[in-house]
């Protein structure tokens, strides 16, 4: 039986994202195969990675909370997409970079610091009308992100010139300081203050981007909203985040969807819920009524003798299942019976006759006794 992901990370089920991230960092540091050579450490590390992969994303976490491991089988973004973590190297860099011989401060890491860097992911919150969420469709959005400067092709240098290798760090992006103590020598590694860790110095900056290599650009995008989305659904638009640095790929744009409330309809999973009001005579005798659905007006049969709060079902008139729009939920209508507070004399006379036939007593205040018994 699979272990509980919250138990694996050692956090409560109501832990917030930061608590989950901190727990993951602590355990990843302890069980990473490059650090922990004990038997079983690698499997434990994979287990920790999978738990974080599910619990760090609101969408997969919600599915896991509701359905357990079966609800997220095959789910997850993959560790390579966890941009907010910066990768395994960044986690361990913060732990080991201050010490020589830590295994994380060698030439490979120096090249990585000055090499291509992926752009940041961006988030956009988008509101949808109720029917837009039900049926999906195309939506135009406006975003502002960093794009590679066309003038300097992202180098940050004026056309015709090139950045030079930083003389302070020799292009590594890092400077080292050796401290000698009675316990031995320690090497502290920090970001080069001259080039800010890039390993390159721009002497003649590009006028178009002021040496940054990127420009802030506002643009319009058309995105496809799948049928059946709900509050909190996340769409990933690849390579529409901020531009990368030094030739690195751009990040992604994550669009979080939020659905406006509807005056008539509510939603419960893939079912649509609404109410319909009928007169007490329609409830007693039965009738045919036209009711509104997300697909438009539909005829509904109210059977004779329908009781208050009876739920009528219109099959396949609900919300399409996300990822499988052929499958739809139902439309559930709660019947509310409108009992009048006042009746005309002719109507009262007829009702009193009916009450006598049924043997019901009527009070001074009207026909509560009769109508109350009628719907028992």
From Swiss-Prot:
Signal peptide per UniProt: none
Residues covered by region (Disordered): 102-121
Needed co-factor(s): Zn(2+)
Family annotation (Gene3D superfamilies): DnaJ domain, Heat shock protein DnaJ, cysteine-rich domain, Urease metallochaperone UreE, N-terminal domain
Keywords: Chaperone, Cytoplasm, DNA replication, Metal-binding, Repeat, Stress response, Zinc, Zinc-finger
Placement of CXXCXGXG motif repeats on the sequence: 149-156, 166-173, 192-199, 206-213
Keyword Zinc-finger on entry: yes
Residues annotated as binding Zn(2+) 1: 149, 152, 206, 209
Residues that, per the record, bind Zn(2+) 2: 166, 169, 192, 195
Matching SMART domains: DnaJ
Cellular localisation: Cytoplasm
Domain J stretches: 4-68
Entry's family note: Belongs to the DnaJ family.
Subunit structure: Homodimer.
Role description: Participates actively in the response to hyperosmotic and heat shock by preventing the aggregation of stress-denatured proteins and by disaggregating proteins, also in an autonomous, DnaK-independent fashion. Unfolded proteins bind initially to DnaJ; upon interaction with the DnaJ-bound protein, DnaK hydrolyzes its bound ATP, resulting in the formation of a stable complex. GrpE releases ADP from DnaK; ATP binding to DnaK triggers the release of the substrate protein, thus completing the reaction cycle.
UniProt domain comment: The J domain is necessary and sufficient to stimulate DnaK ATPase activity. Zinc center 1 plays an important role in the autonomous, DnaK-independent chaperone activity of DnaJ. Zinc center 2 is essential for interaction with DnaK and for DnaJ activity.
HAMAP family: DnaJ (MF_01152)
Name assigned to this protein: Chaperone protein DnaJ
Protein's organism: Trichormus variabilis (strain ATCC 29413 / PCC 7937)
Classification of source organism: Bacteria, Bacillati, Cyanobacteriota, Cyanophyceae, Nostocales
The gene coding this protein: dnaJ
């Amino acid at each position: 039986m699979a272990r509980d992901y919250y138990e694996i990370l050692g956090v409560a089920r109501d832990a917030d994202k930061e608590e989950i991230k901190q727990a993951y960092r602590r355990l990843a540091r302890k069980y990473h195969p490059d650090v922990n050579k004990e038997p079983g450490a690698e499997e434990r590390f994979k287990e920790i990675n999978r738990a974080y992969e599910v619990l760090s994303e609101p969408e997969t976490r919600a599915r896991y909370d509701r359905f357990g491991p079966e609800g997220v089988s095959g789910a997850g973004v993959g560790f390579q997409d966890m941009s907010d973590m910066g990768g395994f190297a960044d986690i361990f860099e913060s732990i080991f970079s201050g010490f020589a011989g830590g295994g994380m401060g060698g030439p490979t890491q120096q090249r990585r610091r000055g090499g291509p860097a992926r752009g940041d992911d961006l988030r956009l919150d988008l509101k949808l009308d109720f029917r837009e969420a039900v049926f999906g469709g195309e939506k135009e959005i406006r975003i502002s992100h960093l794009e590679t400067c066309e003038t300097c092709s992202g180098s940050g240098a004026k056309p015709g010139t090139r950045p030079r290798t930083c003389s302070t760090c020799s292009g590594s992006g890092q400077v080292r300081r050796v401290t000698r103590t009675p316990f031995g020598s320690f090497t502290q590694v920090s970001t080069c203050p001259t080039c800010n860790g890039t390993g390159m110095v721009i002497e003649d900056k590009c006028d178009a981007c002021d040496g940054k290599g990127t420009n802030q650009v506002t643009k319009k995008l058309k995105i496809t909203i799948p049928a059946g989305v709900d509050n909190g659904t996340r769409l990933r638009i690849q390579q529409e985040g901020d531009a990368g640095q030094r030739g690195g790929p751009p990040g992604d744009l994550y669009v979080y969807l939020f659905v406006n409330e509807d005056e008539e309809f509510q939603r419960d999973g893939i079912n649509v819920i609404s109410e319909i009001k009928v007169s007490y005579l329609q409830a007693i005798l039965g009738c045919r009524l036209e009711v509104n659905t997300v697909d438009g007006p539909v005829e509904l049969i109210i059977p004779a003798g329908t009781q208050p709060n009876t739920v009528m079902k219109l099959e396949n008139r609900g919300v399409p299942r996300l990822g499988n729009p052929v499958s739809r939920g139902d439309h559930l209508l709660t019947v509310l019976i409108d009992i009048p507070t006042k009746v005309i004399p002719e109507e009262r006379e007829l009702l009193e006759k009916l009450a006598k036939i049924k043997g019901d007593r009527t009070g001074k205040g009207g026909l509560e006794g009769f109508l109350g018994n009628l719907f028992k």
